[in-house]
Amino acid sequence: KILKVLKKFKVEILSSGGTYKKINRLGYKSIEISDFTNSPEILDGRVKTFHPKLYGGILFKRNNKKHQKQIKKIDIKKIDLVIVNFYPFEDAVKTGNDKKIIENIDIGGPTLVRAAAKNYEDVTVITDTNQYIALQNEMNKYRGSTSLNFRKILSRDAFLETGYYDTKITEYLNKANNDSPPPKKKLIGGNLVENLRYGENPHQGASVYSLNKEINIKQLNGKKLSYNNYNLSLIHI
């Protein structure tokens, strides 16, 4: 569906590796990043997106005349939309294979996301397939573009995504180095389980997060839980 809306608004697509092959296999046109940058992937794919043509196109400020002159001089095209799915690091951890785990630490993806999120005034960044429908609606509403408010929300979500991803890498490395002194900083990354009926007081909002992707609590009956209901449930457990 996302490819359909991109085609509808004549968006030129850049992609790499397996994504490039899949897009073309589905019958849509895309340009391989190595062709766009004129720089091949190296080190078994470890280096494929680090190039000024990409980061310049993402990071330059559209209303900055100095930036405009620089990108024109070195022939950099603007990049208005960045869509990235990170390597499945958490799934790799479950295998227990250290080599596989290390190779699934995504470097290029989070870097692209952070660049796009920093320049949210001009760039839309997508980090979750659940955001595709919202993006499609925005592009249809704004004739191929998106609103600033939408981009700001996505920027926040993008930094949450990279922060969570780094937290999981840190957790793995902490467990792999049990004999080392405790780290000076501690990161905690959680996933939203559900939004509660209200917080400690009826006028407050509340949500439940889990350190894992799922939480082993099942509500058998009754209305939706509030913050106080959840606290009492956990106490009784």
Task: For every predicted segment, state its role.
Residues 18-89:
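Glycine-rich nucleotide/cofactor/substrate-binding loop typically near the N-terminus or early
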Residues 62, 107-110, 230:
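Catalytic, metal-anchored helix/loop core of enzyme active sites in primary metabolism
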Residues 76-198, 203-205:
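Internal alpha/beta core interface subdomains
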